[in-house]
Design a protein with these regions (language model features):
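Conserved, structured core segments of small domains
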Residues: 1-86
């Protein structure tokens, strides 16, 4: 399943988040990062594929102390076509 994660890092946590990101010591079991795009400030977006919502929850939980994350499920063109076909 495809997901978009929109994140916002609170100002007081920017340095800690940068340090954690620099070590890339994050658990990704069951999750594949497609890409990350960072704004100049404290926000960004990540595209990923997850086997299930538990894998996604575990991934996002490890960042929950430093930032707010909104998770949005996504569909491919093919999946949208299946929805439209009924």
């Amino acid at each position: 399943m495809l997901f978009r994660l929109d994140y916002a890092i609170s100002v007081e946590n920017v340095k800690s988040a940068q340090e954690r990101f620099a070590t890339m010591d994050e658990k990704r079991d069951g999750l594949t990062v497609i890409g990350r795009w960072h704004e100049a400030g404290n926000r960004g977006v990540m595209g990923c594929e997850a086997e299930d919502v538990v894998a996604l929850g575990k991934f996002s939980h490890q960042w929950s102390d430093l930032c707010d994350i909104d998770i949005v499920p996504l569909m491919t063109d093919e999946e949208v076509g299946q929805v439209r076909a009924g």
